[in-house]
Every structure is written in C-alpha cells, then in structure tokens.
Amino acid sequence: MQAAALLSGARGVTCKFIRRLRAGMDGCGMKFLFKRSLITGFLIGLQFVLIVLGIFTLSNKIVYVYAGLQVISLITLILVINKKDNPSYKLSWIVVILLLPPVGVIIYMMWGNTVFTRSVKNRINKSFETFRFQLPQNEQSEAKLRAFSRTYARQSEYLKRSTGHSVYNDTETDYYSPAEAAFPHILAELKKATRFIFIEFFILAEGKMWDEIHAVLREKAAEGVEIKIISDDIGSGDRQQEGFVRRLAAENIEMVSYNRFRPALNTFMNYRDHRKIIVIDGVTAITGGSNIGDEYINVIDRHGYWKDTFLILRGGAAISFTEMFLSMWQSITHKTYKLEDFCYNPQEECTDTNGFVHPYADSPFDNVDTAKNIYLQIINSARDYLYITTPYLVVDDEMLGALCLAAQSGVKVKIVTPKNGDHWYVHMMTRSSYGPLMEAGVQIYEYTPGFMHSKLIVADDEVATVGTVNMDYRSFYLHHECGVWLCHNKTVLDVRGDIDQAVAVSERIRLEAWNKRPAGTKLLEACLKLFTPLM
C-alpha cells in the first residue's frame, strides 16, 4: 500500500511540476530551452527510485513482504518462460530478473511486460488487421518470382504471410546514398502531389530540411491536397518548438504524435514508431534509414559525416506504404478509412523489367518478428557474400549464430558499423559483439568519416533489404519498423556498390586489437549485457 501511495503521489506531483515548469518558462521567455523529454525522463526515473526504495524499506521491516517479493519474482519468471516470445529475448529478461531482485521484476514490468498494454495492443492490431485484408494480392508477380528462384520466392512468401503485403514487379526503384543526394528528388516528388501526401517519421526536427519540405507542404495544402503527418513523440518531441502542431493545423496540415511521452511510469512508453514513410498520391513512396533532420543531410555536424539512405518507389508497391500509414493513423485518431480511397491507379503501371519489390512492416504487437526473420532468411540463404550496415549491433544468440555459421560456411560476411557512436552505452555494446563474429571469420569495419546510420543487407548480387531496421533488440522486438525486400533488381547492385564504397573508407577491426581492450572496458561491457533487452 505504501509503495502504491508513493507511485500515485509521484505521478500527481510530476504532472503538476511539468505544467508549472512549462508555464514558468513560457512566461520568462525560456520555452525553447525546455527539454520535455529530459524533464519527463528525470521524473519517471524519480518515480522508479521511489518505488524501489519503498519496496526495499518494506521488505527490510516485514518478513512477509520479503517473502511476497520472492513469490512475485518466481511467478514473473514462470510467466516469462511460458510467454510466446523469442527464446533469446526471454533469456535476457530471465537473467535481469534473477540477478537484480526485486528491481529486475520492476524493470521487466515497465519495459518487458506486455500484459498491461493489452487493450492498446488490441486496438492497434485491429486497425492493422482491418487494412491488411484490404491489400491487393499479386498472383502474377508471385508466379514470376517462383519461376525465377524458389529460394527467394519462399522469402517473399514469408513476408506475405506475416504482413499481408504482396510482391510487385511493376515498381521502379531509385536508391540514394547519402541522404542529401535524395533530398532534391524528394522535394520534386512532393511538388507532383495532386491528391494527398502522407508523412510518417520517428524524428521530424525543425531546421533547414524541414523548412524546405514545409514550404512545399504549405503550398500543396493551399491547393487542396490532403496532408497528414505522424511523428514519434519521443523521437521528435524535443526537436519541435512549442505550438508546432497548432501552426500546421492553421495551414490545413494534420499532424498527430504516436505514443505521447508522459511523466508517469507505464508499460507502453517503450514501444516507438521508428518508421520512415512518405507517400504521394498512392503512386510514389519513399522510405529508408534517414529521418527529417539537418544532421541526416549533413547540414549540421553531429558525430561526424552522417551516412544514410533513401529509397524512392514508383508503381504498385506504393500501396503497401499507403496501408502502413493509414493503419497507424487510424489507430491513433480512431477515425475509419478505406484503403480503396487512397489506392494506386493500375493504369499508371511501370514495366515489369524492374525486378521484384516487396515492402514489409513489423509491429511489436503481433508476436511475429518479421524484420528479424527476413534478415535471418537472407543470411541463411547467402552463398557467396553477405554485406550489412547498421548503426547498432546488439543481437541475440540466434542472430549471432546465423552470422557466424554463414562465415564458417565460406560466405564472405562484412559488417559496417559507426566509428563514432551516438549513444556511448549502445556503441560499447556494439563493439562487445565483435569478438565472436571475428573468431568465426566475419569481417568487421567501422565507418571512420563519422556515423553509419544506414540499415542495409545485401547478398549474392540478387537480394537486399533497405529500410528502418537496426540490428538490435529495440528494432527487432519493440519498434514499429518498415522496409523493402528487393530481388533481381538494379537497386540490389546499387546497395552492394554503396557498401563497397563505405568499406573503402572504413577501418577494419582486427581480433588481436579487440582482445587487448582495457580490463575496465571489458568489465563495463559485461555489466551492460544485463540490459541488452533495453537496447
């Protein structure tokens, strides 16, 4: 009861504190210095500490409380073991619960448990399922892919069964890296809009990049084009000035935030919308690793030169991204839409000489690890080479084993990560993964010009994926993600060439040097491994 009272009181105090602090800063002209996520994060941490202190205080005074906590820990372990989840992911949480009682249980309840978010999950899943059954199925494209390769047809079939999206061979693709190379083309595509523009990004930050996009959106809204925008509240909250959404609404531009970040402990705050999507008239779609922010197009320097990607699709596959956006929009706004009202016009089909394009989405709420599984399929089917770029390399035993097995089977495996990390603890965990991979024969490179933010995988000059998926626990298990699987497509060679160029300016990490890391670094890496489910 005391712990519950502490939590209730902390929530009330923090909400009042946020309102008063914001009002005070607005009144003294300091509202742009106000970092909502920083203050909110601090207050959430304060609530966490108060709960832990309350539990320890009670358990030290009352033996029954201590015994009860042990029973709760045991029950939690049983629930985790029997949960329908990836075994490696479950094992990581079991270690946390066993080594940090009773704090480990609290951490799991806040960041690993999904029972308390069931109503929210059901609402989002219902929205996603509603649109999934409205997606067109392309049996002709599927037959052509089966005739080309049974192996790659099985990968595409998996994506279809797990997401509802089909494969297309009527879609042109243009790959751009770095992201600033795509920016003029993105503006040009936005200017072509006559019906609607949908935009969904994890980070939508004010600055030069946004200003140029906004100028086009404002013009198009004045022409009557329907414009809807989704941004993630944690990703974007601190990078938009006060009244940002209100000013857009005055220009007939609708904007909503996914999963508002509030100053109270809750189990849903861990799930974020990490997708990057632009859809224009249902005919053109844009995705990739880049967000909307000046560092992504190297207008400002953050962690050195920023290496990122965009992929522009024109043709039938654009409807998949229309569906992804509308399903998310409907889950947030509770408004009902029909995909047919925004669908692609078949009369504008491209030729079928562009290879195969299969968009896919991944949700943390459907108990299907789509992004991770398609990565595993590409890794396991590679024959000659497998190249990967990722900003983070924090993988479970299943992914680690697949990469090692590929290298041990004679496949040339190269992985490029950043030389400069954006989060020291994740960067340290990334580097801690190098050893077992290099021992198996995987070549590890660090991108020396700056920060490698591209999320790419390519194999055998035949198959690749471009999208938003990092090789870490958060992307595989906790985020909404999206990507494009490509086969027998010119973009596959573009991706391979891009990674070759990145390798040429990267530093190869050698096992001998890695083994000579300071003892303090090794100890800190070992401690951080306890928290891999959060990274």
Predicted stretch roles:
Residues 388-390, 447, 466-467:
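Thr-Gly-centered strand-to-loop micro-motif
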